[in-house]
Amino acid sequence: MHRNFRKWIFYVFLCFGVIYVKLGALSSVVALGANIICNKIPGLAPRQRAICQSRPDAIIVIGEGAQMGINECQYQFRYGRWNCSALGEKTVFGQELRVGSREAAFTYAITAAGVAHAVTAACSQGNLSNCGCDREKQGYYNQEEGWKWGGCSADIRYGIEFSRRFVDAREIKKNARRLMNLHNNEAGRKVLEERMKLECKCHGVSGSCTTKTCWTTLPKFREIGYILKEKYNAAVQVEVVRASRLRQPTFLKIKQIKSYQKPMETDLVYIEKSPNYCEEDASTGSVGTQGRLCNRTSPNADGCDMMCCGRGYNTHQYTKVWQCNCKFHWCCFVKCNTCSERTEVFTCK
């Protein structure tokens, strides 16, 4: 979502929060306000709009989670022809890729994980209603290992279920792309769930660790980004299996395998080969690489040869000037030299 638009939503809902505190309940006026705002957010499916209207506090967290996923996507692909950008309608989840490619698989997985991560964190911090710490991780004592649940364990199950309800609600059409998107959403959430951390604190006399109090915490989202990038590199091409009578897509199977072998839960899957992302193409959502910075000496994806797709590159020269070798003189002034450096940057034609 556009940064200014997100700030606008935040301030509007902040006003709702003030009204809520003053009145002690969400009045009909506030409900009407939430209805107006939720109808202004682009790209929401009907069920998503209904969640927005019933949980206006949650839509801010959802937007932050989706943005966290988009930011991580841009970081992971910052040196590639595709840098997590696309042509098309802007939504709370960014601009969607029209092709069911491995890039689309990554964007769906990372944003679904981002929403689950943000919702779980907001619950632990007391910033969302109807949720909090994981109640099931309280009071249990493991005598053999000498630890017990304590503190505030992150309720990852709530975050995942909320992400499932909201993110998956945009899949309306009953086609192969829907099955692909739902699988990748779930893969992103599953990776997050599997990387939850157990943190413990020791208790005992004179620094001994007679017993430990433990709780679960969320992993750094950068870790999830790296794992999903690896799964992107190993993404599995699938095809749809249709029901014999209605011919509707039923489930996905790995392509080019005769048996009905399904992909693994945490596999990223795609149904169409990726475009080369060299040129701007509205039909695929590719923005092309014209004007992108490139590295003239690199043989990798960020190198001008690969990034510019053989079109060549432009050289830009500029001089950077700054104060250097500063010395303090008694008394009392600082004297500096002026240093300069000539720099070249290269952009794709």
From Swiss-Prot:
Tissues showing expression: Expressed in differentiating lens fiber cells.
Lipidation (O-palmitoleoyl serine): 206
Alphabetical keyword list: Developmental protein, Disulfide bond, Extracellular matrix, Glycoprotein, Lipoprotein, Secreted, Signal, Wnt signaling pathway
Gene Ontology cellular component annotations, sorted alphabetically: extracellular space
Residue span of region Disordered linker: 238-266
Sites carrying sugar chains: 83, 127, 295
Keyword Transferase part of the UniProt annotation: no
Disulfide pairings: 73-84, 123-131, 133-152, 200-214, 202-209, 278-309, 294-304, 308-348, 324-339, 326-336, 331-332
Subcellular location, record wording: Secreted, Extracellular space, Extracellular matrix; Secreted
PROSITE patterns assigned to the protein according to its UniProt record, in alphabetical order: WNT1
InterPro entries: Wnt, Wnt7, Wnt_C, Wnt_CS
Signal peptide (from-to): 1-24
Domain of life: Eukaryota
Gene Ontology molecular function: cytokine activity; frizzled binding
GO terms under biological process: canonical Wnt signaling pathway; cell fate commitment; cellular response to retinoic acid; fibroblast proliferation; forebrain regionalization; lens fiber cell development; neuron differentiation; positive regulation of JNK cascade
Family: Belongs to the Wnt family.
Function field: Ligand for members of the frizzled family of seven transmembrane receptors that functions in the canonical Wnt/beta-catenin signaling pathway. Required for normal fusion of the chorion and the allantois during placenta development. Required for central nervous system (CNS) angiogenesis and blood-brain barrier regulation.
Protein name (Swiss-Prot/TrEMBL): Protein Wnt-7b
Source organism of this protein record: Gallus gallus
